[in-house]
């Protein structure tokens, strides 16, 4: 009886093991995070703030980044907007639109997202 059970297990498990060795695991696809787009989804290129030589977003973006979580990287536009009024509601491109999404805020310190 024990031999039959072992043979039955071998018949079931062997094809699975062979299939596993023939078909490689699908590698997780790495998707590059376009940080410029994440940070500055609504850029007014006539008034781009700079910090240590790097370009950053307008006040229009700062209004929306105030809603986002703080990251490990100290970004000048991640601080809370002063007072209770929004920093700015429009610029020369029109009304501000939310340009930073929570799912990217959570992972903004990563260069790639694995999908």
Curated annotation (Swiss-Prot):
Residues 1-28 form the signal peptide. Disruption phenotype: RNAi-mediated knockdown results in increased probing time and slightly lower rates of successful blood feeding. Its main location: secreted. GO terms for cellular component: extracellular region. It comes from the Eukaryota. Keywords: Behavior, Secreted, Signal. It is found in: Secreted. Female saliva (at protein level). Distal-lateral lobes of female salivary gland (at protein level). Not detected in male salivary gland (at protein level). Immunogenic; elicits antibody response in individuals exposed to Anopheles mosquito bites. May serve as a marker for evaluating exposure to Anopheles gambiae bites. Required for efficient probing and blood feeding. This is Salivary protein gSG6.
């Amino acid at each position: 009886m024990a031999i039959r059970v072992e043979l039955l297990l071998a018949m079931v498990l062997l094809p699975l093991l062979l299939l596993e060795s023939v078909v490689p695991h699908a590698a997780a696809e790495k998707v590059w995070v376009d940080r410029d787009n994440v940070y500055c989804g609504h850029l007014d290129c006539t008034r781009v703030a700079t910090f240590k030589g790097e370009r950053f977003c307008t006040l229009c973006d700062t209004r929306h980044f105030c809603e986002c979580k703080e990251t490990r990287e100290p970004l000048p536009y991640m601080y809370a907007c002063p007072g209770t009024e929004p920093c700015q509601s429009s610029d020369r491109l029109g009304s501000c639109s939310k340009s930073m999404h929570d799912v990217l805020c959570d992972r903004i310190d990563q260069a790639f997202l694995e999908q």
